[in-house]
Amino acid sequence: MLTITSYFGFLLAALTITSALFIGLNKIGLI
C-alpha cells in the first residue's frame, strides 16, 4: 500500500512539474 501511494505521489508531482514547465514555455513563446 505504501509503495502504491508513493508511486501515485511521484506521478502527481511529475505531472504538476511537467504542466508548469509547459505553461511557462508557452508564456515565453518557445512553443
Swiss-Prot record:
Chief site of localization: plastid
Pfam families listed in its UniProt record: PetL
Membrane-spanning intervals of the chain: 4-24
MF-aspect GO terms: electron transporter, transferring electrons within cytochrome b6/f complex of photosystem II activity
Alphabetically ordered keywords of this record: Chloroplast, Electron transport, Membrane, Photosynthesis, Plastid, Thylakoid, Transmembrane, Transmembrane helix, Transport
Compartments in which it is found: Plastid, Chloroplast thylakoid membrane
Entry membrane topology: Single-pass membrane protein
GO cellular component: chloroplast thylakoid membrane; cytochrome b6f complex
Swiss-Prot/TrEMBL GO biological process terms: photosynthesis
Subunit annotation: The 4 large subunits of the cytochrome b6-f complex are cytochrome b6, subunit IV (17 kDa polypeptide, PetD), cytochrome f and the Rieske protein, while the 4 small subunits are PetG, PetL, PetM and PetN. The complex functions as a dimer.
Family of the protein in this entry: Belongs to the PetL family.
Annotated function: Component of the cytochrome b6-f complex, which mediates electron transfer between photosystem II (PSII) and photosystem I (PSI), cyclic electron flow around PSI, and state transitions. PetL is important for photoautotrophic growth as well as for electron transfer efficiency and stability of the cytochrome b6-f complex.
Protein's recorded name: Cytochrome b6-f complex subunit 6
Gene behind the chain: petL
